[in-house]
């Protein structure tokens, strides 16, 4: 976030460091996730870089809880973190047993299928779609080609029956387009998978210059977590490998004409 808004405001690391009373190497360490600024420094960054209040609040919470490896917050708060992870991290892996991940959804899917999962107001749906668009466009605009792997349960594809045929076709074409990109891979799990394998994402810095620390994102009904604890990340890595082993390529799944999807949408 520091790097993003410093670049956006056209300021150097030395300039920001001088304002905050630290050297430019310290600012560089913040931007490379080697060190976390303290709360006072976050307040200074927010002021001088004109960081939006919501993001500033999130950064303050991170600074206050720097020692915690499992950062708990509501979905909206942690979604702001995911937005930046998708802009800067080098490896992005997502599993979802019920829905197509937001960065791969079409407008029709967002407004036609997502509302069936819970009651959303029109304003919430509108804001949610705007946020998904921002995230997907920022990710696809990256020139460093981060590795993106999506593993989706075939339940998510069978739920396309709730859309009209043109909208089903558009969503499948969206998935096929993303899968065709050299740095993207979409795979489908069409068999039983481990109990408790609810949706989660793994983000890694990889080769990205400004990628954040490795972490796992997961959520329950009223909260979500960004997990940096190595032993817990390892358990999610193990689960990811199980799911990967049970998955097949999107093209293979569609070519099998499972549930008529490939036949309806060549």
Residue ranges: model-predicted function:
Residues 164-266:
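C-terminal regulatory/effector modules of DNA-binding transcriptional regulators
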Residues 3-19, 24-25, 29-159, 238, ...:
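Interdomain hinge/linker segments and adjacent boundary elements that couple functional modules
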């Amino acid at each position: 976030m520091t790097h993003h808004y410093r670049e956006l405001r056209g300021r150097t690391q030395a300039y920001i460091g001088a304002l905050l009373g630290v050297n430019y190497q310290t600012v560089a360490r913040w931007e490379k996730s080697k060190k976390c600024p303290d709360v006072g420094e976050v307040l200074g960054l927010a002021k001088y870089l004109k960081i939006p209040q919501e993001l500033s609040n999130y950064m303050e919470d991170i600074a206050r809880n720097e020692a915690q490896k499992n950062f708990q917050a509501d979905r909206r708060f942690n979604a702001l973190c995911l937005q930046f992870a998708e802009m800067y991290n080098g490896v992005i892996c997502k599993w979802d047993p019920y829905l197509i991940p937001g960065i791969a959804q079409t407008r029709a899917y967002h407004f036609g299928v997502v509302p069936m999962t819970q009651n959303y107001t029109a304003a919430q749906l509108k804001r949610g779609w705007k946020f998904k668009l921002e995230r997907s466009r920022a990710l696809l605009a990256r020139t460093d080609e981060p590795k993106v792997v999506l593993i989706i349960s075939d339940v998510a594809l069978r739920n396309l029956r709730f859309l009209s045929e043109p909208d089903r076709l558009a969503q499948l074409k969206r998935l096929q387009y993303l899968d065709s990109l050299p740095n993207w891979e979409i795979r489908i799990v069409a068999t039983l998978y481990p109990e408790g394998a609810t949706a989660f994402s793994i983000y890694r810095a990889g080769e990205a210059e400004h990628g954040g620390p490795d972490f796992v994102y997961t959520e329950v009904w009223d909260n979500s977590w960004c997990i940096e604890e190595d032993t817990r990340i390892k358990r999610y890595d193990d689960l990811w490998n199980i799911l990967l082993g049970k998955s097949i390529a999107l093209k293979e799944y569609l070519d099998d004409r499972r549930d008529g999807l490939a036949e309806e949408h060549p």
